[in-house]
């Protein structure tokens, strides 16, 4: 359960561990993984890719730029590429985040949902 102090925290992404779910549409493949957000840096991954990027937040909104790179060839990538750069924008709701993303390398739009799991220092 998230630790929130005051109403302002409900519209912030706290430094912490988040689960991430993403999809390219209702009848399209879905993916999931984990990310750590800490002071504007985003790090994470799933069974085939690792993620590295930056994020910013203001007035209950967030923006992120993420580069994905393959670490395992045992599981296919949802994106179909070994490396891609994605940009996301969205809204922070009760400490979690929902938004949309795209990449000039991919002809897809992604829906993304970050769920806060635990705080880090």
Give names to the regions the model predicted.
Residues 29, 36-38, 47-49, 82-86, ...:
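Residues that act as N-cap/strand-start positions at coil-to-secondary-structure junctions
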Residues 29-42, 64-76:
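Short, charge- and proline-biased low-complexity linear segments
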Residues 26-30, 50-52, 71-77, 105-111:
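Short, surface-exposed beta-strand/loop "edge" segments at domain boundaries and coil↔beta transitions
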Residues 13-17, 34-42, 58-61, 90-96, ...:
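Short, solvent-exposed coil/turn segments at beta-strand boundaries
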Residues 2-6, 32, 54-59, 96-121:
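Edge beta-strand at a domain terminus
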Residues 20-22, 42-45, 66-67, 99-103:
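Short beta-strand segments that buttress and anchor functional surface loops
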Residues 2-28, 99-101:
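Tryptophan-anchored aromatic micro-motifs
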Residues 47-96:
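Contiguous, well-ordered beta-strand patches that form the walls/edges
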């Amino acid at each position: 359960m998230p630790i929130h102090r005051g109403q302002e925290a409900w519209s912030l992404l706290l430094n912490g561990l988040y689960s991430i779910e993403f999809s390219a549409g209702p009848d399209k493949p879905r993916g999931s993984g984990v990310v750590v957000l800490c002071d504007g840096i985003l790090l994470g991954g799933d069974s085939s890719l690792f993620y590295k990027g930056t994020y910013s937040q203001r007035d209950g909104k967030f923006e992120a730029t993420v580069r994905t790179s393959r670490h395992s060839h045992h599981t296919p990538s949802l994106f179909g590429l070994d490396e891609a750069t994605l940009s996301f924008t969205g809204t922070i709701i009760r400490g979690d985040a929902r938004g949309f993303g795209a990449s000039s390398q991919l002809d897809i739009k992604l829906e993304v949902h970050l769920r806060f799991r635990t705080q880090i220092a």
